[in-house]
């Protein structure tokens, strides 16, 4: 009887720890469009899909143009809006104006229910 209780207690503790670990998982980038280091026609939106539902008020992105063909230039911020998708697991970034030919970097910061911020970036070029 004692051995059964010990095994049952161990099973319950392992199950609880696995459940709590998944409940506090950080969001991870699953896929982006455009993908990192891609060369694309000017996208109307940049989509970042994550493993967790995002908290919109704590998640966002900043788009920067880092290179323009034939010109030396410092990085230049590009006006864009970031909003969650309908399912809450994607961040959709919409530039205010069509993107010009050049290279861009999108820095993102997202937060899910665990409230820990996760940051990253992707780069892409517009032909």
Swiss-Prot record:
PANTHER family: INNER MEMBRANE PROTEIN YEBZ. Cu cation 1 binds at residues 26, 116. Belongs to the CopC family. GO terms for biological process: copper ion transport; response to copper ion. This is Copper resistance protein C. One of its GO terms (cellular component) is periplasmic space. It holds the Pfam family CopC. It comes from the Bacteria.
């Amino acid at each position: 009887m004692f051995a059964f209780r010990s095994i049952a207690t161990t099973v319950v503790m392992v199950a609880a720890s696995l459940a709590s670990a998944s409940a506090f998982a950080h969001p991870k980038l699953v896929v982006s469009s455009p993908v990192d280091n891609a060369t694309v026609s000017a996208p109307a939106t940049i989509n970042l899909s994550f493993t967790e539902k995002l908290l919109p008020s704590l998640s966002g992105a900043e788009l920067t143009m880092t290179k323009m063909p034939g010109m030396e230039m410092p990085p230049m911020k590009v006006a864009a809006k970031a909003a969650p998708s309908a399912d809450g697991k994607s961040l959709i970034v919409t530039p205010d104006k069509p993107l010009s030919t050049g290279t861009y970097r999108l820095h993102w910061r997202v937060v899910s229910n665990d409230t820990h911020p996760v940051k990253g970036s992707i780069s892409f070029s517009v032909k």
